[in-house]
Amino acid sequence: MLPEEILFMVFSFLDVKELIACSHACSHACSQWRRICSDKLLWVQKAELFGPESPIEQFINWRKLLCVEGSYSILTRKKIIRGIAISNSGMCKAYNYGVIFLEKYHNSYRENEVYYKPYPLFDSIKYIENILSCSYGNEDPYYFYRIDIDNRVPNENIPDIIENFIGMSKKYPFINIFAFVCTQEKIQVITPLVSGLNLTMKIFHQDRWENVSEWISEVIWKRDFMCGSTFCLKKLPSLSELSVLSRYESELVTY
């Protein structure tokens, strides 16, 4: 077995993703390697290579703030998530336009209440403009669009529909999460139109509409987790959580 000083030297040449991969391999080898992989000094060294938004640097800062109980509650107390649901048929859930629709999702971190404000697919932009331009005081902003597109929507209309909603997100940048709920036929039409866009979005088959609130809740939690600067975790994330966060980015995924 190599001396620890040499092992530290070897690990110091690895970037974060390589270090995580090596951590997985070493966890099955011996306790010495596993302990070195998880050593906070090694992660501090890696954090110095990144800017202030680095998740790894956030971990180090959070570790220094473990005694701040009130900060941790931001990640664990109930989260209100507001969004806008657009549908021409209510194919995934019967919407009553003008009535707020609520779905609850519990993950292992906190309770999430996802509120949809429903609007019809066509002529919805003017209604959305009205609510976004109003002041809501201390209410949370509208985070996301959920857009239901079934086979009754002509294919030739879909590019304009998507362009309109993407344009809204540019005007109101706090709305940058998109969940498209579609039939298989529409998935094939929409996918090439939205691929490559620098937005957080996901396409769901209409049979999996129940997963939309779960996905949105997880996205919002990861943003709170990665971007906050005044809260901390009770403990460092596990190696599997580090691996997920190292790969996490805005991407298009068909569920």
Curated annotation (Swiss-Prot):
Residues 1-46 form the F-box domain. It holds the Pfam family F-box-like. Disulfide bonds: none annotated. InterPro entries: F-box-like_dom_sf, F-box_dom. This is Putative F-box protein L126. It comes from Acanthamoeba polyphaga mimivirus.
